[in-house]
Amino acid sequence: MTDDIFSVPCPICQKQVEWSDKSPFRPFCCKRCQLIDLGEWAAEEKAIPCESADFAMNDEQEDWRAH
């Protein structure tokens, strides 16, 4: 086993984060950055790309986008 410290940039602020049990919010540097990211997903500012947003809908499902 090596003693190399693996670190990654925080997706929000780019601060280097040690990838270990010492960093409970990894890959984020802190709870604040973690919550900012969650808020971006909740506000649909971030999304997983796909061909069409209604690919899973069929005739029996209600169109939730109209609400």
From Swiss-Prot:
Q: Name one GO biological process term.
A: regulation of DNA-templated transcription
Please list the GO terms describing molecular function: DNA topoisomerase type II (double strand cut, ATP-hydrolyzing) inhibitor activity; zinc ion binding
- Which residues are noted in the entry as Zn(2+)-binding? C10, C13, C29, C33
List required co-factors: Zn(2+)
Q: Which UniProt keywords apply?
A: Metal-binding, Zinc
The annotation note on the cofactor reads: Binds 1 zinc ion.
| Physiological role | Inhibits all the catalytic activities of DNA gyrase by preventing its interaction with DNA. Acts by binding directly to the C-terminal domain of GyrB, which probably disrupts DNA binding by the gyrase.
Q: Which family does it belong to?
A: Belongs to the DNA gyrase inhibitor YacG family.
The subunit field of the Swiss-Prot or TrEMBL record says: Interacts with GyrB.
Q: Which PANTHER family match?
A: DNA GYRASE INHIBITOR YACG
Q: What is this protein called?
A: DNA gyrase inhibitor YacG
In its UniProt entry, the species of origin is given as Pasteurella multocida (strain Pm70)
